[in-house]
Amino acid sequence: MSQAPNPVPWRDPRRVPRSRRESSIVSGVEEGRVAYANVRKVVFLLVSTGAAEIVLFLLAVATRSPLPLLPVQLLWLNLVTNGIQDVALAFEPSEGGEMRRPPRSPREPVFDRVMLLRTAASALTMGVAAFAAFHVAIGAGWELDRARNGVLLMMVLLENVQAGNSRSETTALLRLSPLRNPLLLVGTL
């Protein structure tokens, strides 16, 4: 029994025009690079904010100060900031120019030296700033609970700024439109 010729040649995978196959491979590579960049952004956000909280507590222990946050406040802080923003950051759209960058080595870690330095700088900045605010509030005569609430508010603010800062490894926060990622904008508000 003879078969009728296929009137649409691209339905047969052996007959797909080469340019169509190549364009789908290129778009797949580009999407993979965007996904990898978003994984790096989420890792940077989570590690830097977690390290900032550790710095805050280490400074309090080192100076024999009262704990700047209660455990329930720390849990609430992580739920409000990291629980929403990391998911929204995973949907960050392409920054553009992914295909102009050279391919990365398969041996290159997600958390490389540059990210380690950025994480250390931002974690130290956030942790020291929050501890300084706590120390100043206590020194000004604030009650301990009021000072803790102030530190909690400050950490929420700092971690919201850090979420915006995590959106790009190469572009400054103020140069990025907040409307490019409406999920992150809503999650931050």
Please state what every model-predicted region is.
Residues 2-174:
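Membrane-embedded transport module
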Residues 174-185:
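Cytoplasmic-side transmembrane-helix entry/capping segments in multi-pass membrane proteins
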Residues 189:
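C-terminal substrate/ligand-recognition segments
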